[in-house]
């Protein structure tokens, strides 16, 4: 059974318990996705998804974030869609609260290091090329473009390959 709780600050939390498991999945859903992007911002939500794993105020590098979560025996990842971006980790149940702390710090206080931004740019461009080389994924993109032409819903969630290029880190 799942329970929805809204905190006084408006944060919505969904919890559920499966007593027969010894693991916990912690997910943070952010209301950021491709449908909210203007044409010149296409791909920004996906780009930010990647950047949040590059470091935060208390976990300043990608390696420190990975070592913290994997040190518990956990795994972490993220995904961007049209309406939300989700950051998640699956860890032993004993590490759930520490994992909440790590993911919350990533979302609330990301580092956005200029050098990391430039490195991630090439990773994202390669990822987009891989998607475009997959017949199944490409078919889905073309269907979306056909159904919703000239609209955010008709764009590739990751953005066009050229859209990832203009994003720059703040000075």
PLM regions: where:
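N- or domain-start disorder-to-order transition segments that initiate the globular core
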Residues: 1-21
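Charge-rich, well-structured scaffold segments of protease-associated domains
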Residues: 6, 17, 64-171
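Hydrophobic alpha-helical segments, principally membrane-spanning helices and signal/leader peptides
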Residues: 12, 31, 134-135
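A short local loop/turn or secondary-structure capping micro-motif enriched for an aromatic residue
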Residues: 22-24, 96
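M16/MPP (pitrilysin/insulinase) zinc-metallopeptidase core fold and M16-derived inactive scaffolds
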Residues: 25-90
């Amino acid at each position: 059974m799942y329970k929805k709780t809204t905190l006084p600050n408006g944060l919505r939390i969904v919890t559920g318990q499966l007593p027969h498991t010894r693991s916990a999945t912690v997910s943070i859903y952010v209301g950021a996705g491709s449908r909210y992007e203007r044409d010149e911002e296409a791909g920004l939500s996906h780009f930010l998804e990647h950047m949040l794993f590059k470091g935060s105020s208390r976990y300043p590098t990608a390696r420190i974030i990975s070592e913290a979560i994997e040190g518990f025996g956990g795994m972490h990842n993220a995904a961007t869609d049209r309406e939300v971006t989700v950051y998640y980790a699956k860890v032993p149940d004993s590490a759930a609260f520490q994992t909440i702390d790590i993911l919350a710090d990533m979302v609330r206080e990301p580092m956005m290091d200029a050098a990391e931004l430039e490195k991630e740019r090439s990773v994202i461009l390669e990822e987009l090329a891989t998607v475009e080389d997959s017949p199944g994924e490409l078919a889905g993109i073309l269907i979306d473009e056909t159904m919703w032409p000239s609209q955010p819903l008709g764009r590739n969630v990751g953005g066009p390959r050229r859209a990832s290029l203009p994003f720059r880190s703040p000075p």
